[in-house]
């Protein structure tokens, strides 16, 4: 009798192990990219970087050229040292669909030059202000991948922290690029909840280039497409 019980226990253990292997094989990794617009802010961007560093995650920062200077240089260098990537959000934040071609080119080129000078990298991505974009802008600019993102409208200064959290977590999905702003304290506070909650839901939080790499999808240059998801 004891022998039978031992054999049955061994069989049960084996079946449980197989079931667990099958279960883990079926679990597909989930990824989401964090991105922040309109910085660097002397006050709030360092606070945001602190939150990212404390949680061990990286993000993509879309910088406005007129905010890039000797005073904000240490913040930009810290982004790079943390493994975050630094991208283009134009020089003065105009609607690119409503300005002359020469100004569009100047807005992008000036910011590219500043980012190269202060971050040591040439931006691959462009997030047009207000995500305003069309085929003409894409053709004119060329050589850039246009990035959109899922926004909780956190640019609104009066928006409660709880609403920023809820609007993000209720709509997040695998492969999403999340769009925030590192220009106000309420978003900094919201990230203290959003990041742990995303991790608890099984998401790995990455920068935008890493999201595309992990998805196996290569985004297109010279394309009118705006990427809000990697796949």
Annotate each PLM feature:
Residues 15-19:
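Sec/Tat signal peptide C-region and signal peptidase I cleavage site
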Residues 94-99, 154, 217:
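A short acidic, helix-capping loop that chelates divalent metal ions and anchors anionic groups
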Residues 5-14:
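Bacterial N-terminal signal peptides
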Residues 32-35, 59-63, 85-90, 124-127, ...:
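Structural recognition of the beta-strand scaffold that forms the well-ordered cores
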Residues 122, 132-133, 137-171, 203-215:
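His/Asp/Glu-enriched short active-site or ligand-binding loop at hydrolase and phosphoryl-transfer sites
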Residues 20-97, 103-104, 110, 114, ...:
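Active-site beta->alpha N-cap acidic-glycine motif
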Residues 39-43, 70, 98, 102-105, ...:
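Soluble non-cytosolic domains of exported or imported proteins
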Residues 21-27, 55, 68-69, 186-231:
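C-terminal domain-boundary segment and adjacent tail
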């Amino acid at each position: 009798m004891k022998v039978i019980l031992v054999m049955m226990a061994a069989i049960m253990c084996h079946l449980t192990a197989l079931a667990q292997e099958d279960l883990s094989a079926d679990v597909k990794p989930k990824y989401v990219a964090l991105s922040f617009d309109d910085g660097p802010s002397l006050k709030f961007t360092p606070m945001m970087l602190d939150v990212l560093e404390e949680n061990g995650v990286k993000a993509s920062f879309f910088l406005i050229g007129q905010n890039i200077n000797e005073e904000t240089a240490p913040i930009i260098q810290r982004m790079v040292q943390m493994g975050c990537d630094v991208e283009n959000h134009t020089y003065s934040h105009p609607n690119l669909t409503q300005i002359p071609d020469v100004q569009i080119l100047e807005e992008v080129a000036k910011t590219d030059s500043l980012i190269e000078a202060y971050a040591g990298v040439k931006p691959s991505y462009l997030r047009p202000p207000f995500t305003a974009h069309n085929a003409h802008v894409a053709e004119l600019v060329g050589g850039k991948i246009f990035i959109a993102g899922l926004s909780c409208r956190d640019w609104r200064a009066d928006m409660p922290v709880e609403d920023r959290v809820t609007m993000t977590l209720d709509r997040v999905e695998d492969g999403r690029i999340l769009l925030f702003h590192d220009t106000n304290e309420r978003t900094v506070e919201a990230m203290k909840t959003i990041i742990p909650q995303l991790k608890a839901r099984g998401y790995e939080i990455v920068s935008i280039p890493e999201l595309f790499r992990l998805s196996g999808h290569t985004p297109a240059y010279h394309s009118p497409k705006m990427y809000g998801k990697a796949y």
